[in-house]
């Protein structure tokens, strides 16, 4: 191989050995390789290892399984089971799970809608700077989801997520500048942020840019 393949082979060998001792981290890492590595890609194997890691209470494996169960492409869609995994992983402080659990609670996925709890989980997910969580917390402040509307806090958080390449947040900053919503109107700055989102192919951002271009 080109060196990289050999390393993956060695990693698999190493993790396989460790997995026989039921090391959750080794089982989880094997799952990641089979889920994400092009050469070794095998979703069913990934799921097998994630399930074994879950038996060892690995919260990251619970989150990966929740994604599979939520999507329902490789295995049957099961939102109740995904909800349970997310709840356990979220309550053990795993950022991505806290954020996704917040989405479930916000939208009533898995049969339980609680906006104030969704807000709490989004807030908790930001403690380790998890960017999608920062964006969702900003949305809560912007729209008043599970908390009171606070446009200043929303702006700060959207900006933070935008600076880390989260283009949905760039769109929201553009929107706030374009319409003077919560901040002073600045069409030039609005364009800059809409462009960031438009460059990622976001249709709404392209539409907003077109509107601004017609005004000039």
Residue ranges of model-derived segments:
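Short helix-capping/linker turns of helical repeat alpha-solenoids
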Residues: 1-2, 20-24, 36-38, 42, ...
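TPR-repeat structural position
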Residues: 8, 40-43, 79, 115, ...
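Alpha-helical tetratricopeptide repeat
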Residues: 22, 53, 57, 61, ...
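Hydrophobic face of amphipathic alpha-helices that form TPR/SEL1-like repeat modules
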Residues: 29-36, 64-71, 98-107, 134-143, ...
């Amino acid at each position: 191989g080109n060196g990289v393949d050999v390393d993956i082979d060695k990693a698999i060998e190493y993790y396989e050995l460790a997995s026989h001792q039921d090391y959750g981290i080794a089982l989880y890492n094997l799952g990641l390789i089979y889920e994400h590595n092009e050469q070794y890609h095998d979703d069913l194997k990934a799921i097998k290892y994630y399930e074994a890691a879950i038996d060892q209470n690995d919260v990251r494996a619970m989150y990966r399984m929740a994604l599979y169960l939520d999507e329902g492409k490789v295995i049957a869609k099961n939102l109740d089971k995904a909800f349970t995994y997310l709840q356990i992983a979220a309550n053990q402080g795993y950022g991505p799970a806290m954020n996704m659990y917040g989405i479930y609670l916000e939208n009533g996925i898995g049969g339980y809608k609680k906006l104030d709890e969704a807000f709490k989980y989004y807030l908790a997910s930001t403690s380790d700077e998890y960017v999608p969580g920062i964006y969702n917390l900003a949305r809560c402040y912007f729209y008043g989801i599970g908390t009171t509307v606070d446009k200043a806090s929303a702006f700060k958080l959207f900006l933070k997520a935008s600076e880390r390449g989260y283009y949905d947040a760039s769109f929201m900053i553009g929107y706030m500048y374009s319409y003077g919503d919560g901040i002073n109107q600045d069409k030039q700055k609005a364009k800059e942020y809409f462009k960031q989102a438009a460059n990622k192919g976001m249709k709404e951002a392209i539409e907003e840019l077109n509107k601004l271009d017609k005004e000039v």
